């Protein structure tokens, strides 16, 4: 133990950025080295090769900016319209169409094997990495070790590191060349290691699963993941609708489920005013409630003095079908799921 700590001290003392020591006592070296030792012990117990363990722990770096990013994730929430303007812009739509032309055979194979249509695969690819254009900034081993040391989600990030080591070991990858986001997502579809370990697929049959450098592996892995989530290729994701001006906003939680005839009976229509399909399809309902409340308040303040009741603005919302909730198991965000649906429609 002592010799191991000495060797790590030599390797990492100058690797840890000086800012980590800016506040006396802010960085606990003993805790850092004990954590590295626990990683080594666990990795060995889970049959990860000694070569991989040594490679992973050779020159670990604590990165304060990652902790800062994790602690200071923005609480600012874009309106749905602003979010869609950013994520489903004309450039992303155009690039998606180019990618469909570039990879027609691969997309067809993914659809045939996993039942995921090309426009859906492309929508996830576009949202996650702008079709592989997002640059990975952080070496994932350092990111996971840093977040483990931070302590708030040590078990989660420890599991991610071990999964990454197993993936690199199995696929003969240089773990020190695997880069991703500060939170540990990687590749064309931004999988975390535990997701990759469970759903990763060797799409080109070269004996390795590489979702960072191989588009085929990435697409097959995404298709496999969505398939396992239960994707229904014959079902739409959302339906944009208009609600009555005085509609109860408490029903816009995505959790209240009703049949389309039941929603229709409450005054919900298609955007052109036509009736919803009278099928027994069950759907939830979501909208930008905060935005609607602001608009309603503004409408009240500018109402005519002689008006007994302020006119209420038209409410746009989305009926949400089962595929919507499958998307939320990929990324638990209503806005993200609506953006996927919108981009997929543009690429259909």
Give the positions of each predicted feature:
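Cleavable N-terminal signal peptides
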Residues: 9-10, 20
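Flexible, glycine-rich surface segments
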Residues: 175-290
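Solvent-exposed loop/turn segments at secondary-structure junctions
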Residues: 60-62, 128-132, 185, 232, ...
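Bacterial N-terminal signal peptides that target proteins for export
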Residues: 1-9
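An acidic, Gly/Ser/Thr/Pro-rich helix-cap/linker signature
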Residues: 23-111
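N-terminal signal peptide c-region/cleavage motif recognized by signal peptidases
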Residues: 15-19
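C-terminal soluble interaction/assembly domains
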Residues: 244-348
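Acidic/His-rich structured neighborhood in mature extracellular/periplasmic domains
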Residues: 82-221, 227
């Amino acid at each position: 133990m002592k010799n191991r700590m000495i060797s790590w001290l030599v390797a990492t003392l100058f690797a840890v950025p000086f800012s980590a020591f800016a506040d006396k006592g802010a960085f606990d070296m003993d805790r850092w080295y004990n954590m590295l030792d626990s990683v080594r012990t666990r990795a060995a117990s889970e049959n990860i090769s000694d070569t991989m363990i040594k490679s992973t722990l050779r020159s670990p770096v604590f990165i304060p900016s990652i902790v800062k990013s994790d602690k200071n994730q923005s609480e600012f929430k874009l309106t749905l319209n602003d979010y869609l303007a950013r994520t489903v812009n004309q450039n992303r739509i155009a690039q998606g169409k180019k990618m469909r032309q570039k990879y027609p055979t691969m997309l067809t194979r993914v659809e045939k094997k996993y039942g995921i249509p090309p426009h859906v695969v492309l929508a996830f690819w576009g949202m996650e990495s702008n079709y592989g254009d997002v640059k990975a900034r952080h070496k994932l081993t350092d990111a996971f070790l840093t977040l483990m040391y931070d302590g708030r989600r040590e078990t989660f990030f420890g599991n991610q590191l071990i999964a990454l080591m197993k993936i690199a070991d199995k696929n003969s990858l240089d773990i020190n060349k695997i880069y991703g986001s500060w939170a540990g997502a990687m590749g064309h579809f931004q999988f975390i290691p535990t997701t990759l370990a469970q759903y990763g697929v060797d799409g080109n049959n070269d004996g390795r699963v590489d979702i960072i450098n191989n588009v085929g592996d990435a697409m097959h892995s995404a298709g496999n993941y969505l398939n396992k989530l239960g994707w229904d290729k014959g079902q739409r994701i959302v339906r944009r609708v208009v609600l009555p001006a005085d509609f109860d906003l408490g029903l816009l939680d995505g959790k209240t489920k009703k049949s389309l005839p039941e929603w229709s009976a409450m005054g919900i229509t298609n955007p052109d005013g036509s009736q919803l399909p009278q099928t027994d399809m069950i759907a939830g309902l979501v909208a930008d409630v905060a935005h609607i409340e602001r608009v309603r308040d503004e409408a009240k303040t500018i109402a005519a003095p002689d008006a007994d009741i302020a006119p209420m603005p038209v409410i746009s919302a989305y009926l949400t079908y089962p595929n919507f909730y499958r998307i939320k198991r990929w990324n638990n965000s209503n806005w993200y799921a609506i953006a996927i649906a919108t981009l997929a429609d543009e690429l259909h």
